[in-house]
């Protein structure tokens, strides 16, 4: 059993998908999608801090998009900057960067297989990608 819950984040330029673990550390569930504006540096950090405190979160796993050759591109750099901003807001929080290659594609594929409409997919894809990121991390702990 975990002392604190773990959340997973899929950070995009317009949204941050959020997933949360159970206290056993076995499963990840979609929690929320924050609207952000990366261009204007409105990253939703304050809203995320409230969620972290409200849900007794001790660890945050942020998806790190890497290129297939293992290099870090523009989106990866943006995720690393997001980590720095969150760490500034909560210095004692454990933040782990997790290779998220293909997590959004896997989420999209599973939603397509479930015959979810395009409009509904658009609403839940980031949260679902966060579930894939967090579940991958949780599975690595077992």
Swiss-Prot record:
EC class: hydrolase
Gene3D superfamilies for the chain: YqgF/RNase H-like domain
Transmembrane segments: none
Keywords noted in UniProt: Cytoplasm, Hydrolase, Nuclease, Ribosome biogenesis
SMART domains xrefs: YqgFc
GO BP terms, alphabetized: rRNA 5'-end processing
EC number: 3.1.-.-
GO molecular function: nuclease activity
Gene Ontology CC: cytosol
Chief subcellular location: cytoplasm
Organism superkingdom: Bacteria
InterPro entries attached to this UniProt entry: RNaseH-like_sf, YqgF, YqgF/RNaseH-like_dom, YqgF/RNaseH-like_dom_sf
Subcellular location: Cytoplasm
Family: Belongs to the YqgF nuclease family.
Function: Could be a nuclease involved in processing of the 5'-end of pre-16S rRNA.
The protein's name in its UniProt record: Putative pre-16S rRNA nuclease
The species this protein was found in: Staphylococcus saprophyticus subsp. saprophyticus (strain ATCC 15305 / DSM 20229 / NCIMB 8711 / NCTC 7292 / S-41)
